[in-house]
């Protein structure tokens, strides 16, 4: 009789553990492959920006630029300073100069390829195991 009670208690404990495991969320989010992954990235990264752009398109611009005429001389002098600075010159250099003088993109891994590798790594792991919204938002 004691063995039956022990067996019944172990089955009840095992059942409770199974129910608890089913109620727990998965360690990763949703499995997203291919287009679904790209759509999730676009929705996560671009959604709020698109909504902001839509809101700004419907607002009258007069509110934002009411005192714009008073600041034109100040802005012109700031623009002249910016054009003369070394930062502006760095931004206007050709890609070959920026990437070390190599003439082809294939020869220079640079930042572009590094971010592409991160995207490919997250894409494959998200497809295979699943990923959360916070992992997807790390690409923004």
UniProtKB/Swiss-Prot annotation:
Keyword presence, Disulfide bond: yes
Domain of life: Eukaryota
Keywords: Cleavage on pair of basic residues, Disulfide bond, Hormone, Secreted, Signal
PROSITE patterns: INSULIN (PS00262)
A single Gene Ontology CC term: extracellular region
Disulphide bond pairs: 33-127, 45-140, 126-131
Propiece residues: 53-116
Signal peptide: 1-23
Distribution of this protein across tissues and organs: Highly abundant expression is detected in neurons within the ventomedial dorsal tegmental nucleus and the laterally central gray alpha of the pons. Also detected at much lower levels within the hippocampus.
Subcellular location, record wording: Secreted
Sample GO molecular function, one term: G protein-coupled receptor binding
SMART domains documented for this protein: IlGF
Family: Belongs to the insulin family.
Known role: May play a role in neuropeptide signaling processes. Ligand for LGR7, relaxin-3 receptor-1 and relaxin-3 receptor-2.
Designated name of the protein: Relaxin-3
UniProt organism field: Rattus norvegicus (Rat)
Lineage: Eukaryota, Metazoa, Chordata, Craniata, Vertebrata
